[in-house]
């Protein structure tokens, strides 16, 4: 199944209040497959939240579990494995697409100060190592899971 997806839902684009939740910046909105909406939420959170491989794994599981729970509460009776396939494949494919963006940021001196500020790292080398760790989670760990799910 497909649905309307925001495709850029992460903390800077999500406002919480007593009245509810509001999503900002719908420029990337479009159709998405089951599980796909989680990709930007998890992937971008990894760049802004004290990343470790353990943190990434916990975030991945917590977000996916809450997603399935929300689908169930809304009446969806589908196979959670299919949602996991959509999520892991999307995480891998978008992770590959983002490598070029990471490289462009790292080689552009005009971006370096902002990168240091945003990622709270002292050097471009530290930022590159940080980016590599995030990509390792997405392009090794999650890609392996996607491959395993697709093969079973």
Q: Model-found features: residue ranges?
A:
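Charged/polar, solvent-exposed surface patches and flexible loops
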Residues: 40, 69, 85, 89, ...
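Active-site activation/catalytic loop segments of kinase-like enzymes and analogous catalytic loops
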Residues: 35-75, 93-112
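Conserved aromatic-histidine-acidic binding/catalytic patches
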Residues: 1, 26, 51-55, 59, ...
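Secondary-structure junction/capping motif
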Residues: 33, 79, 117-118
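ATP/Mg2+ or Mg2+-diphosphate-binding catalytic cores
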Residues: 93-152
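All-alpha amphipathic helical-bundle segments outside canonical DNA-binding/catalytic cores
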Residues: 76-93
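Active-site acidic catalytic loop and adjacent metal/ATP-binding pocket
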Residues: 1-36
